[in-house]
Amino acid sequence: MVTRILLAAAFAALSISAASAAEPPHGKVTVVFDRPIPNLPGKSMKGVVVEYGPGAASPSHTHPKTAFIYATVLEGSFRIQVKGQPEKIYHVGENFVEEPGSVHLVSANASDTEPARLLAVFVLDTNEKELVTPIKQ
């Protein structure tokens, strides 16, 4: 009986471990700034900090069609690919932009051992509420 319980516990632990390895967790997004732009009626600027744990990634997604995005890496490194561009790794202090209507194919922590953080600044229509829309596969 004890052997069965130990085997069941070991199998459960292996199943959880395998599931975690197969599907890394998604990042955490925190809005740090949200303000209308006074001299651009109908436009706002939103700043978000995106944090990925080791090996974390987000599924392919889009941002609002009105959003121009500037991002700079604050910690670690990010593996990024926007449709029509090659995949690239960005390190601390490096930055990139995403044009309105871009499709974000890859957004991942480039490291399996270190966390990664970036600041993304969106300029977009004030009425846009959802910053990320997953692409249905």
Where do the model's predicted regions map?
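Histidine-centered metal-chelating micro-motifs
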Residues: A57-P59, R79, E94-N109
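Bacterial N-terminal signal peptides
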Residues: R4-S15
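Ligand-binding loop in jelly-roll beta-barrel domains
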Residues: P86-E87, G101-E128
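Short acidic-glycine-tyrosine-enriched beta hairpin
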Residues: T30, I37-G42, E51-P54, G84-G101
